[in-house]
Amino acid sequence: MDFRTEFKPLTVQPQQIEGKSFEMITEELGPHPFTDEQYPIVQRVIHRSADFELGRSMLFHPDAIQAGIKAIRSGKQVVADVQMVQVGTNKQRIEKHGGEIKVYISDSDVMEEAKRLNTTRAIISMRKAIKEADGGIFAIGNAPTALLELIRLIKEGEAKPGLVIGLPVGFVSAAESKEELAKLYVPFITNIGRKGGSTVTVAALNAISILADSGVTYEGSAKRT
């Protein structure tokens, strides 16, 4: 086989590839329980992960999408648990409305305090973040300990986020942290089980920012079929 002539690169535009991917996702996913406002987030999570099981496991607080849109349009801060989430997020759409996306886990004072208390930087980063991001979006895709600490701070009345996107991946405390998040009164986006990660957290956050940037409004929660 002559590999020099066998391979022919695609010549379609990126938008065409994405559009075709979304069509395939909708067709393969079939009937689902998600509302019109929730579905774009699920669609982008599946698009990023190629994992329909993960997409079907998504859970939403009834006010999650509207809360996320409101936070972005109001210029609230977005807090990421790790740099990967920060780097992957479309900052232009966040900054357009006066917000910014910040990550605290590598701050020198966070590292020093974590060492002093013999705990994780993820935990200390959440304690710092809540002082600067009242009403903001917390996007956690890597560290279950960060999500568990944020949940504790919410329960104790120390944190009042506008939206929590909690999709950490892993075997230790990942599923459990998401179960606890789903019990809270604050708006959240999460999923059932161990799957998740920074890339799907970015997908969910970017989907929210696209909706916020588009000017879309939701007055109901009509179910898609």
Swiss-Prot record:
Pathway recorded for this protein: Cofactor biosynthesis; adenosylcobalamin biosynthesis; cob(II)yrinate a,c-diamide from sirohydrochlorin (anaerobic route): step 9/10
Active site: H47
GO molecular function: cobalt-precorrin-8 methylmutase activity; precorrin-8X methylmutase activity
Coiled coil regions, renumbered to chain: none
GO biological process, one term: cobalamin biosynthetic process
PANTHER family from the UniProt entry: COBALT-PRECORRIN-8 METHYLMUTASE (PTHR43588:SF1)
Family, similarity comment: Belongs to the CobH/CbiC family.
Annotated protein name in UniProt: Cobalt-precorrin-8 methylmutase
